[in-house]
């Protein structure tokens, strides 16, 4: 994958437009989770150190296109950046017809989704973005799977289009895990439905040596193996699909599970052997014996890809399976990559972020890359690098 990299460019005196993913949760005008902003800071600092005039853009939320909405304004992000960088970061609402920026300046553009034509990737808007800069830097892996004006169109028309350090690191890490993984490779794919992760499961079945499944996905695989799953969430119409996937790759199944009679924070958890699951039981986690077996398997792996908690970890009584596997990944010498919103929440809960080799910032983009799909915003950077 050959793309121009921002780190290799001379940016002194250049106008640089950086597309970041600053789509963070905001409540009462305050940023609630700053992970994406923190991830973007090194790129912004580097551009300033290189002597550029820096303009940063992003989307936030899902406003009606072409209309300003206060709740989707990047104002709280501008305030956060000002504190983090120790300098005022002005938020510019009117920028499409040109802005005055000089070397050492840093400005944040208002939500790109307030601009008509952003989501449709309209040429007219993309050309306006491109006219603002000498160099366009795509650094938002989380939106790389969307061909929009500020992620794809601008890269077509800008004089120079490059990948930022964050995007480059994501592509390197995913390439290492999926392109030529050190073996044995284990993948953990968990979630409520096989249907939403079907392409991920099929793709990984052709790459990894062991495919650990969790959540509702595991229940469908258990049913495919002839086990009773009680009133657990599972997809009867995908039992044959689960069998086909299990025929391609080793899918170790739980030998014991944690069940409850209801899905609630106050639900009483009971550990049962898989053969003892009753008709009115809901499987809400893997059991301790299974967790120990899966942990041993992870400890011997050289590459681990993790997407999704294996139980309802938000309720502590159904979180032990996820905690055990999270710690096994953290303790492993393997190259480990984790991605997906719930996965990141589990990593935070168990305090293991420093011990995962790479944590992906992109949810949908992470999954689409794993599925083997082309990410439009990356593809255009490759095309531009070829000249």
From Swiss-Prot:
Any single Gene Ontology cellular-component annotation: cytosol
Main location: cytoplasm
SUPFAM superfamilies for the chain: Phosphoglycerate kinase (SSF53748)
Sorted UniProt keywords: ATP-binding, Cytoplasm, Glycolysis, Kinase, Nucleotide-binding, Transferase
Residue sites binding ATP per the record: 197, 314, 340-343
Superkingdom classification of source: Bacteria
Listed GO biological process terms: gluconeogenesis; glycolytic process
Pfam families the UniProt entry points to: PGK (PF00162)
InterPro entries per record: Phosphoglycerate_kinase (IPR001576), Phosphoglycerate_kinase_CS (IPR015911), Phosphoglycerate_kinase_N (IPR015824), Phosphoglycerate_kinase_sf (IPR036043)
Cystine pairs: none
Homology family: Belongs to the phosphoglycerate kinase family.
Protein name (Swiss-Prot/TrEMBL): Phosphoglycerate kinase
Organism per entry: Pseudomonas paraeruginosa (strain DSM 24068 / PA7) (Pseudomonas aeruginosa (strain PA7))
Source organism phylogeny: Bacteria, Pseudomonadati, Pseudomonadota, Gammaproteobacteria, Pseudomonadales
Gene designation: pgk
